[in-house]
Amino acid sequence: MDLPEGPVGGPTAEMYLRERPEEARLGMPVSLEEQILNSTFEACDPQRTGTVAVAQVLAYLEAVTGQGPQDARLQTLANSLDPNGEGPKATVDLDTFLVVMRDWIAACQLHGGLELEEETAFQGALTSRQLPSGCPEAEEPANLESFGGEDPRPELQATADLLSSLEDLELSNRRLVGENAKLQRSMETAEEGSARLGEEILALRKQLHSTQQALQFAKAMDEELEDLKTLARSLEEQNRSLLAQARQAEKEQQHLVAEMETLQEENGKLLAERDGVKKRSQELAMEKDTLKRQLFECEHLICQRDTILSERTRDVESLAQTLEEYRVTTQELRLEISRLEEQLSQTYEGPDELPEGAQLRRVGWTELLPPSLGLEIEAIRQKQEVATADLSNPLCGVWQWEEVIHETSEETEFPSEAPAGGQRNFQGEPAHPEEGRKEPSMWLTRREEEEDAESQVTADLPVPLGAPRPGDIPENPPERPARRELQQALVPVMKKLVPVRRRAWGQLCLPPQRLRVTRHPLIPAPVLGLLLLLLLSVLLLGPSPPPTWPHLQLCYLQPPPV
């Protein structure tokens, strides 16, 4: 039997209108059967993917109709939806679902007994619309009671009443659709008439606007004509004034031509000057590059000087340690000398047994013993410190040659810490015979250094008794010409370090003690030999040469700025 069609305005119709918007716009009637099938497909596809599983559709129909999977009609539907036998993986889209379900419903109507199932399916579709979308309880018949509170299979009488009311609503819907179509046609006719009237009004407005524009144009032309007349009179006056200005401009042009010739001559002179300035700028650029290279070389030399200075500092520290060791050794030698003196005094029974001359010579020999070697070593160290302090930065000023020579000669004298009588050796002579002689400067020539070394060796030789000593002969120090030049700005003229001449070994050691020992018959020779051996050991263990710094050879370039 044919199922009645439901109203378009119901919830099922709304769902169908969402699925088929074209048919709803055209006002095509939708059957109740198609609405039920759409509701069934929507219930099985809550995610709106467009495809549902065949097993899900069968489970939904089993839950709605209350039939088991062994039902022959459901098995026939399963075979129709899954003709390839894919099993649980089989899916079907909406169009295929509608076609298969219509064929299946028609086949069931031919065999009869489908009215109850259709009514039950329709009631299940309505119930599924009331349930929330995507709820798994819609697929189980036991959970449907929790939403509606009743069994999903209502009574047959209530279902028949509902179907009859749906048929009435569908008939009224068809009548409303016909009336709506008539109203739409009349509305379209009215809209066409209104459009024609609007076009006519627009044409009239255009004509009115063109007429107004023509009138305004005529007025504007009249005003413009008056303006042109006035302008013509003013132009005539301007023409006369322009003629006078043209004659004046010709005179000015002749004057400007003369000025232009003068400017061209000046321009030629300026071009020549520009060429000269360019050449001068190139020369200055070359000088700048040369100065940059010299500056780089000076910086490199300063770095080397700092490195050498650090090495000299380490050497000074090591020399300080060596000096401390020498002090300890000197103290031990001093104790040994005192012990030997005691032994020497014990070799005789008493001072009364010695001859009077021997006693006097002994007293003189005791009084004229050499001073402490520690004082001499301290004096040498002070001299080295002063010489180190005199080393100046080669880039920070002028090396004062004359002052260095005088200062060096003054520093050669040892500080006298003895009594007013002075320090004397065994023979009553001054302990430092070289005090009256200037110490050779570090800037002496090689020949002068050799002569000084020979004089030192000659002074160190033993002098026979009664012979005049070299130190007793007055000797004038050689005079050296000192350059007295103004302190001026310096620039380096060499690209390498100039080593400073070092002193000879004889100049760096302690000043030798020129001893003239009187052979006393009571003093044994081994004791004198031991004393000489001690003095030689002190001379050999003297301090190392003082540290020197590298200096640049500089020349005067220009006076320094004041």
From Swiss-Prot:
On tissue specificity, the annotation reads: Expressed in testis (at protein level).
* Pfam families per the UniProt record, alphabetical: EF-hand_9, KASH_CCD
Q: Which InterPro entries match?
A: EF-hand-dom_pair, KASH5, KASH5_coiled-coil, KASH5_EF-hand-like_dom
- Report if keyword Thylakoid is assigned: no
Q: Where are the compositionally biased (Basic and acidic residues) regions?
A: 431-448
- Coiled-coil annotated spans: 164-349
Subcellular localization is given as: Nucleus outer membrane; Nucleus; Chromosome, Telomere; Nucleus envelope
Q: What does this protein do?
A: As a component of the LINC (LInker of Nucleoskeleton and Cytoskeleton) complex, involved in the connection between the nuclear lamina and the cytoskeleton. The nucleocytoplasmic interactions established by the LINC complex play an important role in the transmission of mechanical forces across the nuclear envelope and in nuclear movement and positioning. Required for telomere attachment to nuclear envelope in the prophase of meiosis. Required for rapid telomere prophase movements implicating a SUN1/2:KASH5 LINC complex in which SUN1 and SUN2 seem to act at least partial redundantly.
The protein's name in its UniProt record: Protein KASH5
This protein's species is Homo sapiens
Supply the gene name: KASH5
